[in-house]
Each structure stands twice: as structure tokens, then as C-alpha cells.
């Protein structure tokens, strides 16, 4: 089996960062974290990062300029940009600049793992029965909500 791939999460929301970190560690990725662009640049320089998962808006710098810096350094690290609905235009801009994809917030575990599998060539994420049932019940609740509005 190959070496564990190391991913960098660049996210200033510490709760979301911790959730993402736990999901990735559970999927057997190595995980580094940074809360702003300067610390993300340092981590990229000092480590063999296989992929960067970054928020667009950061307290110091932003995910777009981090991507631009990475490209200017001749690095070929795939970037995935996370964004809230209000910043979808930023995500589209990032993809045009070279980001591999973007994820809308809130980020969902299965969606993230399937995206990473596609980008890094790893096996599909197989959700547990519990997470499947949770997703199913959320989908059913959403369907019920829409049906009530229509009725």
C-alpha cells in the first residue's frame, strides 16, 4: 500500500476545521491545518501536500490568492475551494484560475470523500449504515417539507 497522502485544510472556522480533519483522518489521510494564507503558505513550503482544501474568505489573505501563489511557485497541488452560497462567484473564479473543484458549505462528508477520491485516484468512500440512514432521513424530511409547501 502507498504512503498516506497529506491534505492541507485552510479554514478559520475552527469547528468546521476540526470536523473536516476528523473525516479526513478517518479516511486515512494525513491532515495539516492552517487558519490563514500566511500559515498555509508555510505549511505548503514545509510539507509534501497532496491537495489543499481551502475556504475562500480568510482573516488574513484568501483562498484565491493562495491558489495564485501556488501556481506562481510552479507547484502542481490540486486545490478545492469551499464557499458559502454568497461567494459562488469566487469559487467559479478559482476554478477558472486552476482550482480542481469547489464545495458549497455546509460541506457533506460523502460529497467531500467522493470528490477527493476522484482527484486523488483513491477508492470510493463507503458510508456506514448510520450515515446512510441519516442522509436518507434528511432527504425524506426535505421531500416532506417541499410536499407540504405544494399541498
Description of each model-found segment:
Residues 11:
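Conserved acidic carboxylate
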Residues 14-32, 38-39:
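Two-component/phosphorelay signaling modules centered on CheY-like receiver
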Residues 36, 62-65:
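Acidic catalytic/metal-coordinating carboxylates
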Residues 42, 64-75:
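Short amphipathic alpha-helix used as the core "switch/output" element in two-component signaling
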Residues 55, 83:
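Active-site residues of response regulator receiver
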Residues 87-89, 107-116:
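C-terminal output helix
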Residues 129-151:
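AAA+ ATPase active-site-proximal loops
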Amino acid at each position: 500500500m502507498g504512503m498516506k497522502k497529506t491534505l492541507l485544510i485552510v479554514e478559520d472556522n475552527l469547528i468546521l476545521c476540526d470536523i473536516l480533519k476528523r473525516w479526513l483522518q478517518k479516511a486515512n489521510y494525513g491532515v495539516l491545518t492552517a487558519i490563514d494564507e500566511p500559515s498555509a503558505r508555510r505549511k505548503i513550503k514545509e510539507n509534501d501536500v497532496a491537495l489543499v482544501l481551502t475556504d475562500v474568505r480568510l482573516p488574513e489573505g484568501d483562498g484565491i490568492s493562495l491558489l495564485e501563489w501556488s501556481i506562481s511557485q510552479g507547484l502542481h497541488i490540486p486545490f478545492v475551494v469551499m464557499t458559502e452560497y454568497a461567494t459562488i462567484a469566487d469559487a467559479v473564479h478559482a476554478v477558472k484560475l486552476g482550482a480542481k473543484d469547489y464545495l458549497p458549505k455546509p460541506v457533506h462528508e460523502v460529497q467531500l470523500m467522493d470528490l477527493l477520491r476522484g482527484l486523488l485516484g483513491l477508492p470510493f468512500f463507503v458510508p456506514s449504515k448510520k450515515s446512510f440512514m441519516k442522509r436518507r432521513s434528511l432527504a425524506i424530511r426535505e421531500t416532506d417539507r417541499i410536499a407540504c409547501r405544494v399541498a
